Curated annotation (Swiss-Prot):
GO cellular component, as recorded: plasma membrane
Periplasmic topological domain residue ranges: 1-3, 74-80, 133-137
Topological domain spans for side Cytoplasmic: 25-52, 102-111, 159-203
Catalysed reaction, written as an equation: sn-glycerol 3-phosphate + an acyl-CoA = a 1-acyl-sn-glycero-3-phosphate + CoA; a fatty acyl-[ACP] + sn-glycerol 3-phosphate = a 1-acyl-sn-glycero-3-phosphate + holo-[ACP]
Subunit: Probably interacts with PlsX.
Membrane protein topology class: Multi-pass membrane protein
Similarity field: Belongs to the PlsY family.
Species annotation: Salmonella typhimurium (strain LT2 / SGSC1412 / ATCC 700720)
Entry keywords, A to Z: Cell inner membrane, Cell membrane, Lipid biosynthesis, Lipid metabolism, Membrane, Phospholipid biosynthesis, Phospholipid metabolism, Transferase, Transmembrane, Transmembrane helix
Main location as per UniProt: membrane
GO BP terms, alphabetized: phospholipid biosynthetic process
Cross-referenced HAMAP family: PlsY (MF_01043)
Name the UniProt record assigns to this protein: Glycerol-3-phosphate acyltransferase
């Protein structure tokens, strides 16, 4: 156990450091997501600058790079505390990727993937919370913030032994969204539908 957990933490960070948004945009001939749209290399920004196909590819890869290290560690019998650190390491890799100049995304999809191995029931509830919030508000960032706030309570209900590590993960996501929280408070955050309409008008 003592040797497996630190090794999985390093593996998770390196997996997280593979920025799928940047790679997909390069392969598809799209602008660098760090320099276009919102400047965030994540699925939402790729949706704005490249459309649904590219965004779905980024979303899937970002989820997998959080899911695979945690699932592997879970299968190896790593304890919940270490699983939390492994999940955080994957998100830290996404946020500060060593392969891309430490300029990454906000870690939402990767965090979702890291939580998924806890159970499909929890995964469905989390996805539903994010989707409902976005549909009602139009803010992708608000969906992430609300999901991060509620996630520890969901986990406590389904599998309480994972409440602490998921709480650590939620804190990381909320800290990463501090600029979005300020813009939402000032009513300066742009709705995702507005940005998509602007893109269609340009096209």
């Amino acid at each position: 156990m003592s040797a497996i957990a630190p090794g999985m933490i390093l593996f998770a960070y390196l997996c997280g450091s593979i920025s799928s948004a940047i790679l997909v945009c390069r392969i598809a001939g799209l602008p660098d997501p760090r320099e276009s749209g919102s400047g965030n290399p994540g699925a939402t920004n790729v949706l704005r600058i490249g459309g649904k196909g590219a965004a779905v590819a980024v979303l899937i890869f970002d989820i997998l790079k959080g899911m695979l290290p945690v699932w592997g560690a879970y299968a190896l019998g790593v304890t919940p505390f270490w699983l939390g650190l492994i999940a955080i390491a994957a998100c830290l890799g996404h946020i500060w990727p060593v392969f891309f100049g430490f300029k990454g995304g906000k870690g939402v999809a990767t965090a979702f993937g890291a939580i998924a191995p806890i159970g499909w029931d929890l995964t469905g509830v989390m996805a539903g919370t994010w989707l409902l919030t976005v549909l009602l508000s139009g803010y992708s960032s608000l969906g992430a913030i609300v999901s991060a706030l509620i996630a520890p309570f969901y986990v406590w209900w389904f599998k309480p032994q994972f409440t602490f590590p998921v709480s650590m993960l939620s804190c990381l996501i909320l800290l990463r969204h501090h600029d979005n929280i300020q813009r939402l408070w000032r009513r300066q955050e742009t709705k995702i539908w507005t940005k998509l309409k602007k893109k269609r008008q340009k096209d």
